[in-house]
Curated annotation (Swiss-Prot):
Region (Coil 2): 1-23
Domain IF rod: 1-23
Family: Belongs to the intermediate filament family.
InterPro entries in alphabetical order: IF_rod_dom
Protein name: Keratin
């Protein structure tokens, strides 16, 4: 379960970094 949570956090971080690039 913890590994799945880490995957979700990594995915969110990736999306946030992409949004930062757009801005």
């Amino acid at each position: 379960y913890s590994s799945q949570l880490a995957q979700v956090q990594g995915l969110i971080g990736n999306v946030e970094s992409q949004l930062a690039e757009i801005r």
